[in-house]
Amino acid sequence: MDGEDIPDFSSLKEETAYWKELSLKYKQTFQEARDELVEFQEGSRELEAELEAQLVQAEQRNRDLQADNQRLKYEVEALKEKLEHQYAQSYKQVSVLEDDLSQTRAIKEQLHKYVRELEQANDDLERAKRATIVSLEDFEQRLNQAIERNAFLESELDEKESLLVSVQRLKDEARDLRQELAVRERQQEVTRKSAPSSPTLDCEKMDSAVQASLSLPATPVGKGTENSFPSPKAIPNGFGTSPLTPSARISALNIVGDLLRKVGALESKLAACRNFAKDQASRKSYISGNVNCGVMNSNGTKFSRSGHTSFFDKGAVNGFDPAPPPPGLGSSRPLSAPGMLPLSV
């Protein structure tokens, strides 16, 4: 109002009307201000109530949040402790697992080495098995040959027995022949004195032939076998009275000599057979020892036969060299296996 210029009034009525109008204006402004104040106060109270309610809610929420915060702090502490505990347990488990892993790797390496050793041992055993099979096959072959040879020797032993009987019979016949020859010589001495000169020469030739036959010359075996069965008319039985011709006597003496040589050869073969039996027993023990040593040592090497005399060469080692079979006796016999002694005599 101080700032406003008061106009100049010409009359009091104008001044009064002016001040009334101004008072009404201020009154209206006051009324508006009071209404605004009342409205502001009401709004302030509402706002205050609302703010108080919000404050209460905020405080409640703050308390709840603080409680939640405290609970979460406790949970965080518990989780930290649990995490530390889990971490310690995990570290221990990792350490244990690492130790187990290292031990497992070591065991795996050992198992690999053991498997390689087993494979090598298996290969050695297979080689030893093959060598043993070969040795057993060789041994079976030699055993079969030895059995065959023993069968041949048994047959020859039987033949030897029959030959011994024949030799004894021929010895008896030779003794009888010698006795008869002595009688004939005495008779020839008697007749030589009374006979002419030409018969004397014939008798001398006959005497030389008889003396040669008595000395048992080494005649061929073929002749002995050809003349081993002369006619019954020429051979006396020891009880008859028919005389023997000189050729028959010589053949009989040759047969006796051949039979004696056969008996000697059979005795040599028997000695060789005994040596073979001894060598077979020692070789069997040697082979069994070598087979056991080869399987235990897993060397798989076949024992060498060099340096050992085969039992088939025993005849040559013992100095026994059998004669070839005669054409009359050896033609019907089966051939012996290679390396074996000839069985015919």
From Swiss-Prot:
Gene Ontology CC terms: centrosome; cytoplasm; kinesin complex; kinetochore; microtubule; spindle
Lipidation (S-palmitoyl cysteine): C273
Gene Ontology molecular function terms on file: microtubule binding
Region (Interaction with CENPF): 175-345
Region (Interaction with DISC1): 227-278
Annotated region described as Interaction with KATNB1, given as residue ranges: 64-189
Primary site of residence: cytoplasm
Region (Disordered): 217-240, 316-345
Region ranges (Interaction with KATNA1): 195-256
Phosphothreonine modified-residue sites: T219, T245
Region (Required for localization to the centrosome and interaction with dynein, dynactin, tubulin gamma, PCM1 and PCNT): 256-291
Superkingdom, taxonomy of origin: Eukaryota
Region (Interaction with NEFL) residue spans: 191-345
Classification via InterPro entries: NUDE (IPR033494), NUDE_dom (IPR006964)
Sections of the chain in a coiled coil: 27-190
Region (Self-association), start-end ranges: 56-166
Pfam families from the UniProt entry: NUDE_C (PF04880)
Expression sites (tissue/organ): Expressed at low levels in heart, hypothalamus, liver, lung, spleen and stomach. Expressed at higher levels in testis and brain. Within the brain, expressed in cerebellum, cerebral stem, cortex and striatum.
Post-translational modifications: Phosphorylated in mitosis. Can be phosphorylated by CDK1, CDK5 and MAPK1. Phosphorylation by CDK5 promotes interaction with KATNA1 and YWHAE. Palmitoylation at Cys-273 reduces affinity for dynein.
Alphabetical UniProt keywords: Centromere, Chromosome, Coiled coil, Cytoplasm, Cytoskeleton, Developmental protein, Differentiation, Kinetochore, Lipoprotein, Microtubule, Neurogenesis, Palmitate, Phosphoprotein, Transport
Bias-annotated ranges (Low complexity): 329-339
Gene3D superfamilies for the chain: 6.10.250.1080
Spans annotated as Interaction with YWHAE: 189-256
Name assigned to this protein: Nuclear distribution protein nudE-like 1
Name of the encoding gene: NDEL1
